[in-house]
Amino acid sequence: MNFRIEQEIAIFEFDDGKANALGHELIEQFFFALDEAESQAKGLLIAGRKGVFSAGFDLKEINEGGSAAAKLIKKGAKLFHRMFDFPKPLVACCAGHAVAAGAFLLLSCDYRIGSGGPFKYGLNETAIGMAPLPVFGSELALSRLSPRFLSRAVIQSEMFSPDDALEAGFLDQIAEANDLFEIGKSKTLELSSLPSVAYGKMKRSIRASSLERMNIS
């Protein structure tokens, strides 16, 4: 984990050298970054490693089944709620694949910037037999994805190229890989220049219904 504050914005880079799978440890690192950013910075930029933003929940922990799997999914649900409810600008730089819970990370952010390349974005839960989606998943998909792509993304488990992910609603912008991080910083600074209290109030007002349904605390 690399967390730092530059020019009054927080930056959280996560890279486990593999698939950036969301297990208990990485989720705790996300909570730390969110808490620190909320108290010390005007916005937060998150960035996965080149090639893989996140491949989703850690299947080793999920495949333990029973209470272990349930605990991980519940912890993930709390993370996505925390991100979707984060009162300051939350920007993601995605330089690789974002699948399943990795795609939900993107859907939880305010502004998502991806890079071109042979990368896939999507929700593969139907394809791997994990249905129905947890409430956090259906709410994020309904809130952020284009209605025209909703069935293809959620029900049909279609994987999207960066260009199609932009149209579907997984991304807001595509940038050259070499420029991605600097563009992400610039966007976070731009959004952080907006009145902070108004930004948080506006975000929560338009997401209130989804946040209420997503809340499991």
PLM segments and residue spans:
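Short, active-site-adjacent cap segments at secondary-structure transitions
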Residues: 51-54, 98-100, 120, 209
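Glycine-rich beta-to-alpha transition loops that act as phosphate-gripper elements at the mouths
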Residues: 93-99, 153-158
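Short, well-ordered beta-strand core segments
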Residues: 90, 112-113, 174
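Conserved CoA-thioester-binding segment of acyl-CoA-metabolizing enzymes
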Residues: 1-49, 81
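Amphipathic alpha-helical segments at domain termini/boundaries
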Residues: 1-11, 153-193, 198-213
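CoA-thioester-processing core
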Residues: 99-152
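Glycine- (often His-adjacent) and acidic-residue-rich active-site loop
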Residues: 2, 28, 40, 48-79
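Hydrophobic/aromatic residues within transmembrane alpha-helices
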Residues: 46, 105-107, 165, 184
